[in-house]
């Protein structure tokens, strides 16, 4: 399955609790909670380029499935991780105690990030 496309956030659950748990300042949490950000994914075989735009903040990450890479997190921190493909429609990675699963079903991408007992879920639709 090819993940390439541009997606806009439709809904999210537990944004504030998750962002507080990862150390984002309250001011940025309040600014970001109502923004319907976009994600653009360009997939070329096992190589992915991901651009996430939330208001004026843009985060770009590139990775190749199964290879260690450096990624920028939501808080701006750089972490080393490995992204794996599960089945043909799930991208899975773990960093700093956070498990991130991005699942594509048709035109809907569901991103789930779990830290301890806090589960942040974001649903985006292809635009």
Swiss-Prot record:
Plays a role in lipoprotein-mediated cholesterol uptake in hepatocytes. Binds cholesterol. Binds free fatty acids and their coenzyme A derivatives, bilirubin, and some other small molecules in the cytoplasm. May be involved in intracellular lipid transport. Keywords: Acetylation, Cytoplasm, Lipid-binding, Phosphoprotein, Transport. SUPFAM superfamilies: Lipocalins (SSF50814). It holds the Pfam family Lipocalin_7. Monomer. Forms a beta-barrel structure that accommodates hydrophobic ligands in its interior. CDD domains: FABP1. This is Fatty acid-binding protein, liver. It comes from the Eukaryota. The lineage of its organism: Eukaryota, Metazoa, Chordata, Craniata, Vertebrata. The modification Phosphothreonine is found at residue 51. Disulfide bonds: none annotated. One of its GO terms (biological process) is fatty acid transport. One of its GO terms (molecular function) is fatty acid binding. The modification N-acetylmethionine is found at residue 1. The modification Phosphoserine is found at residues 11, 39, 56, 100. One of its GO terms (cellular component) is cytosol. It comes from Sus scrofa (Pig). The modification N6-succinyllysine is found at residues 31, 36, 46, 57, 78, 90, 121. It is found in: Cytoplasm.
């Amino acid at each position: 399955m090819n993940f390439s496309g541009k997606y806009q956030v439709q809904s999210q659950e537990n944004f504030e609790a998750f962002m507080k748990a990862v150390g984002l300042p309250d001011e940025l949490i309040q600014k970001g909670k109502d923004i319907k950000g976009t994600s653009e994914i360009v997939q070329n075989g096992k190589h992915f380029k991901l651009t996430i735009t939330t208001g004026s903040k843009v985060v770009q990450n590139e990775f190749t499935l199964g290879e260690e890479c450096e990624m920028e997190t939501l808080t701006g921190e750089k972490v080393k991780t490995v992204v794996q493909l599960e089945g043909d429609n799930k991208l899975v990675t773990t960093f700093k105690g956070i498990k991130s699963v991005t699942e594509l079903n048709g035109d809907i991408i569901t991103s789930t990030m779990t830290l301890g007992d806090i589960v942040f879920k974001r649903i985006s639709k292809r635009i």
